[in-house]
Structures are given as C-alpha cells and as structure tokens.
Amino acid sequence: MAERELRKRCRRLLNELDIHPPLDVEELCRRVGDQRGKPIRLIAHPIPVPGPYGVWIATARADYILYQQETSKAHQNHIILHELGHLLAGHTSDEQDDELLAGLYPDLEPDAVRRALRRTSYDTAHEREAETVATIILEWASVLDKVAPRNSEGPARRMASSLADRIGWL
C-alpha cells in the first residue's frame, strides 16, 4: 500500500478513535482493541538479541503485542506502534519457540509465536507498511505536542486543538 493511502487510512481510523496528544500508546491500543472487538494485550519481555524487538500474535480471544523489555520507553512505544501498524494496515498475524511461549504464554499457540519472531527486518512490504504507520502516529503526536506543550493553557492549547482538527493525523 502506498504511503499516501496509509496516511489516509490512519487518519480516518485514528480520528474515529478520538485520540489526542499527548499520545498514550496503551490507551490507543485499548481503543483499537475495543473497536476490533477483542483486547490487545501488551507484554514486555526480555527478547533475545539479535532478533525482533516485537511481535504481534492474533488469537481468537485477544491480540498480543510482545515487545522488548530491555530498551527505553520511547523505543518500546515505537515497537508497540510498529506492531499495532500491522493491525491497522490490515496484515495478518504471523503465528514461534515452543519452550519460550509455553512457559510465558500458555494460552498461545507455539507455532503462532515462532512464525512471528522470524520477522527481523524491514525487507518486506508489510514490515515497511507497519513502520510507516508507527512513524505517522509518532509524527502527528510530536508535531502537535510541540505546538502546544502538554502543560500549556489558553491560546497555545486552543491553537493545538484547532490544528488537530484541521490537520488530523498528518
């Protein structure tokens, strides 16, 4: 999918979710899960390096986003948004290491996790799309947050609200 179309799709969906700066990644995931009719479970885990930083696994009862525990909060948010990008771009979940998942996530199918952890680069179109979605969301949040910092009031906050309504999700 072209970047322009991804931007339109993100803008449309995220406006429906009524998310505003400052960006709360957990709240965004909660709202996307509500819209999809099943929760999104965020799980921090010390994922071995080299390897992926995150993985999305869809099950009948919930979507799971596993993300690297051993990194900064900003990087964790980006990882989560990348995996959320797979959902928002309409990708299917990959379905990985039996022992790892059996111990940590007994209700997940080991085959599902094994396939998901094989995604380690942005070489495929789906990985680039997911990364683009994460970037679109972070760009939007950072641009509007700079216009009116989180703790600003009065004219600066009104200007940011005005821009958010006009520009939407960039």
Where are these regions (language model features)?
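Metalloprotease/metallohydrolase-associated module, dominated by Zn2+-dependent proteases
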Residues: 1-28, 32, 94-170
